[in-house]
Amino acid sequence: MHTTFRVVAIGMLMLLAATAPALAVGPQDGAYAIIESAPGSSDLQTTLVVLQEGTALGLALLFPEGFWVFGSGTLSPSNQIQGSLFQADGTAYGSFNLTIADGHVNGTIVEEGTTYSAAGQRIF
């Protein structure tokens, strides 16, 4: 009986391991190293985390200081997404208009009234 349980448990683990790659939801999923630049401002280095399910995308911008904001939107056929950004407590923070394709991100991010050009590539 104990051996049967082990065989079943090992079989379940092997099944889960085999299906894990199929659980990757969308081609835009991942973390992207982003440089945000605006005239008269220092460049900002941020990390953009993207989660995709179908055409729905959720994203978070992680700043080196430990601050983060989030947003969501629908990915267009041309791989463009736009929407609002919010702080962790739900307070409005800004907006974004990005194109995410082939491991690269380009577009604009508005943070507290300043418009930044954003560009970067997937890091994982």
Set out the residue ranges of the language-model regions.
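Bacterial N-terminal signal peptides that target proteins for export
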Residues: 1-9
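A detector of low-complexity, intrinsically disordered, Ser/Thr/Gly/Pro/Ala-rich segments
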Residues: 1-2, 17, 106
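Central antiparallel beta-sheet cores of small beta-barrel/beta-sandwich binding domains
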Residues: 25-101, 106-124
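Bacterial N-terminal signal peptides
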Residues: 8-18
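Sec/Tat signal peptide C-region and signal peptidase I cleavage site
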Residues: 20-24
